[in-house]
Amino acid sequence: MNIQINILKFFQSIRNPILNAFFLILTISTEVPVIVILTAIMYWCINKKYGQKLLFSLTANIAINTGIKEYVKAPRPIGTEGLESLRVSTATGYSFPSGHTQTATTFWTSLMIIFRQKWMYILGLIMILGVGLSRLYLGVHWPIDVICGWIFGIVFTIMFSKLFDIVDKNKDYKLLLLTLIPFIIFIFIVKSESYIKMLGLLSGFILGYIIEDKFIKFNTIDEYKKEISFSSKIDTNKDYIVKSAYRFILGIFTLLLVFLIVNYIMP
């Protein structure tokens, strides 16, 4: 514990307004509004399958992270003698493992797996390390929280990405539903309302994926370009942008409505 406190004190000792702003931006980059908007753009506008893979990894990792937090119940460093934490209003719940770190690791590892480009590897690595370090700089997590957030994020993202590829290729919806079993069993271990909410998020994605894949089958830019001839008189780019904008606005509005309803039912 002394080593962890000393690490946090080191970050505390180098604080200045410029670094405060820098690390604050990094930590905000992985919070719900930003992640939701970026993922929604990927899913509804750019490439549906990439978006689904990203969503599966994110929802599963968030559920796992919340479950571990509620099981371990590790206190945060906030309030520890000699430490001054910043932006504590968003550092709610238990400490281990770091939710921001695991979410950032999941998001950027997923994009690295999807795109497999050098620039994405570099950007992803910078963001993964940066978000984790921002949690230490702000003094809202112990080093062990961040380290395990990195490890869990990488391991589970690789696992769920491969699982999604198998499910999507073979249309094995039963296998996808079976992944919920260990999550459901864990409800009786942690008995946590927060975990149940996150499990609901994962369940919602799985059911939504099955319904969309079997019945709706909307197109994103990749499928749209395949179906529309570029020699057509229709301005395909303009037509697609308008459809994507409508879909994005409607989707965000629906998500906001669901969020408000859920928070009203389970405040």
What are these regions (language model features)?
Residues 1-21:
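Short, strongly hydrophobic alpha-helical membrane anchors
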Residues 12, 27, 97:
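Short acidic-aromatic active-site loops that bind/stabilize oxyanions
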Residues 22-23, 38-39, 44, 52, ...:
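Membrane-embedded catalytic cores of phosphoryl/pyrophosphoryl-handling enzymes
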Residues 25-36:
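The first (N-terminal) embedded transmembrane alpha-helix
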Residues 53-71:
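N-terminal signal-anchor transmembrane alpha helix
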Residues 67-81:
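Transmembrane alpha-helix boundary signature
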